[in-house]
From Swiss-Prot:
Main location: cytoplasm
Entry similarity comment: Belongs to the TRAFAC class OBG-HflX-like GTPase superfamily. OBG GTPase family.
Name of the coding gene: obg
Assembly and interaction partners: Monomer.
PROSITE patterns the record matches: G_OBG, GTP1_OBG, OBG
Organism: Magnetococcus marinus (strain ATCC BAA-1437 / JCM 17883 / MC-1)
Protein name as catalogued: GTPase Obg
UniProt xrefs under PANTHER family: DEVELOPMENTALLY REGULATED GTP-BINDING PROTEIN-RELATED, MITOCHONDRIAL RIBOSOME-ASSOCIATED GTPASE 2
Keyword Ribosomal protein (UniProt): no
Residues reported in the UniProt entry to bind Mg(2+): S173, T193
């Protein structure tokens, strides 16, 4: 499935139905009074968050959404039927902005959450409302009131607890494939990841969190260079960032400089990302001996000083250090949720977490088609349990 996280659409609620001009005509009552009914209300335009959606791709093919108008009033004081609301479903985590001034109208963060974007027009009054002592047979009725209209921008931000950042080929996709059932494309060349990937990491049986892997960042990303800049918004909601830096060779360029480059890009994108708790993950450590690892650590300590975040040395190839990292991150996420008042774990909140395929597949029936992913047919759920 193609991934689209931004869209611009036009909304128009339904016009109200017109009032009716009618007079009572029955047997033995040839000149009855006015009995024209009111028009029905036009349909509202309502956004609804749907946990089973994970992209805005549908809005690429349809940009105009118009609700139906209300039915006109009828005689015998019959009010016209109101039109049904037009429900537009969007992924959980979608921000809706007024395109005119960029104002945030709503942040759809819960499955089933609804937002009234455009209210339908009221129906017009029938001529029975205009009867008076001086006008016993009014031939006047109101037209229906017009519905509201506007252009809005939809911006989808994934709901994940942990975000993976780093330069291309730093091992982010490999890590998420090792700690969860996610099966992103993995290859030995830069920019293998072209869109965000989500995975559910289960710690013991009663706690889990969602991890997001975004395309690699390069110098100048916050100015539009590379792919990562377009997806940085997807980690703005994360509680913790894992910054992966590969240390496969001491002859390579300076790993500390690469770390500082990406940190500068995060700060350039937003102060919010710069202030998030983070963990420094030195990846591909199986390619270095213990002495060389300590040399790399000393470089970071000397140049970062007190600003140095917690460090984990790991190898996704051998599994070294992964369990300790998972439990440490799980503890940080749990503490963050307690502060935020979010009790529970990711699987309990699965419908509200961007409708991610990674979350839905855990509870999908075994016969469900899986044609959209050629690499995950043998995927298994990973549950980390201390021995």
């Amino acid at each position: 499935m193609k991934f689209l996280d931004e869209a611009k659409i036009y909304l128009k609620s339904g016009d109200g139905g017109g009032g009716c001009i009618s007079f009572r005509r029955e047997k033995y009552i040839p000149f009855g009074g006015p009995d024209g009914g009111d028009g029905g209300r036009g349909g509202d335009v309502i956004f609804q968050a749907d946990g089973h959606l994970n992209t805005l791709i549908d809005f690429r093919y349809k940009q105009h959404f118009k609700a139906k108008r209300g039915t006109h009033g009828m005689g015998s004081q019959c009010t016209g039927a109101s039109a049904e609301a037009l429900i537009i479903k969007v992924p959980v985590g979608t921000i809706i902005r007024d395109d005119a001034d960029g104002t945030i109208l709503v942040d759809m963060v819960e499955d089933g959450q609804q937002f009234l974007a455009c209210k339908g027009g009221d129906g017009g009054r029938g001529n029975m409302h205009f009867k008076s002592s001086t006008n016993q047979a009014p031939r006047r009725a109101d037209p229906g009131f017009p519905g509201e209209e506007m252009w809005v921008r939809l911006e989808m931000k994934l709901l994940a607890d942990v975000g993976l950042v780093g330069m291309p080929n730093a091992g982010k996709s490999t890590l998420i494939s090792k700690v969860s059932a996610a099966k992103p494309k993995i290859a030995d060349y830069p920019f293998t990841t072209l869109q965000p990937n989500l995975g559910v990491v289960r710690v013991e049986m009663d706690h889990s969190f969602v991890m997001a892997d975004i395309p690699g960042l390069i110098k100048g990303a916050h100015e539009g260079h590379g792919l990562g800049m377009f997806f940085l918004k997807h980690i703005e909601r994360c509680a913790v960032l894992l910054h992966l830096v590969e240390i496969d060779s001491l002859e390579d360029d300076d790993p500390v400089s690469r770390f500082q480059t990406i940190e500068a890009e995060l700060a350039g994108y937003s102060e919010q990302l710069a202030q998030k708790p983070r963990i420094l993950v030195l990846s591909k450590a199986d390619l270095l001996g213990e002495e060389d690892r300590q040399v790399v650590l000393s470089w970071f300590k000397e140049r970062l000083g007190e600003a140095m975040p917690p460090v984990f040395i790991l190898s996704s190839a051998t599994g070294e250090g992964i369990e300790a990292l998972v439990y440490h991150v799980g503890g940080m996420v749990k503490q963050w949720r307690l502060k935020q008042g979010k009790v529970g774990h990711a699987l309990e909140d699965a419908p509200t977490r961007a409708g991610s395929k990674a979350l839905r597949d855990e509870h999908a029936p075994s016969w469900q088609d899986d044609d959209d992913d050629d690499d995950d047919d043998d995927g298994v759920e990973v549950i980390w349990v201390r021995e």
